[in-house]
UniProtKB/Swiss-Prot annotation:
PANTHER family: ATP PHOSPHORIBOSYLTRANSFERASE, ATP PHOSPHORIBOSYLTRANSFERASE ATP-PRTASE. Its EC number is 2.4.2.17. It comes from Brucella canis (strain ATCC 23365 / NCTC 10854 / RM-666). Keywords: Amino-acid biosynthesis, ATP-binding, Cytoplasm, Glycosyltransferase, Histidine biosynthesis, Nucleotide-binding, Transferase. Belongs to the ATP phosphoribosyltransferase family. Short subfamily. Lacks the C-terminal regulatory region which is replaced by HisZ. SUPFAM superfamilies: Periplasmic binding protein-like II (SSF53850). GO terms for cellular component: cytoplasm. Pfam families: HisG. This is ATP phosphoribosyltransferase. One of its GO terms (molecular function) is ATP phosphoribosyltransferase activity. It catalyses: 1-(5-phospho-beta-D-ribosyl)-ATP + diphosphate = 5-phospho-alpha-D-ribose 1-diphosphate + ATP. The lineage of its organism: Bacteria, Pseudomonadati, Pseudomonadota, Alphaproteobacteria, Hyphomicrobiales. NCBIfam families: hisG. Heteromultimer composed of HisG and HisZ subunits.
Amino acid sequence: MSVTLALPSKGRLKEKTLAVLEKAGYKVVLPDDDRNYRARVEGEDDLDILFLSASEIARELGYGSVDLGVTGEDLARETLAHADERVAIEAQLGFGHADVVVAVPEVWRDVTTMADLDDVAADFRQRHGRRLRIATKYWRLTQQFFSQKHGIQVYRIVESLGATEGAPAAGSADMIVDITSTGSTLRANRLKVLEDGIILRSQACLVSARRSHTSRRVEEIAARIRAGLEI
C-alpha cells in the first residue's frame, strides 16, 4: 500500500520542503508539466507526492485522504476542529516561521494585556452600543484563545477578506488577530501586539493524518525526515 505525501505547490515553502526531503535522502522527481500536481521519489515506488496549497494540505490531512503533509501549524489548527484528534505533528521543519497574534491600535495605551482587553470588551457595548469587533481569518483560533483560554465573551468576529491589518483604520473592525513574521506590517498600520497576545508560534511542520499515524511506513518516513533535520 502506497503512502501519499502532500507538499506545498509553489514558492519558498515548496523549495525549502524539497530541500528538507533531499537532506533526508528523498529525491523528488518533478513532472515536466507544471500543471501536473503529482511527482515521484527516486527509489521509493510506494511513496507518492501530491502538490497542493498549504491550506488544502491541512484540509486533506483532516479528511485522511493523504497520509503525510507539509503545512503550517497555524493552518492545521485553524482548518481542523479538534485538530489533535485528527492529525499529529511529526516534526517542526525550521522554516515558515510566523506568529498568530492579537493586535490593537497603538492609541489604546492602557491596553497591554488580555486582561486589559477583557475590561475593554466588557465596557465596549455600554459605551458604543455594540460588541468589540475583531477582524481575522483565524476565527477558530481566536474563539479558542479569547473564550476558552481567557474567558472573554463579549466580542464579535468580523471575517477578513482582504488585508486584515487595515481593518481598524478602515473602520470595519476595532482590532485584529493576524499572522506576522516581523511585525513591520502591524507597526506600519499603527497596531501593537499585546504582551500575552501570541496565540500560536507557527512554522512549517510535517504532519500525519491520525488514521495513518501508526502505519509502519509512515513512521519510517517521518523518522527519516526527522533524522535529516539533525544533520
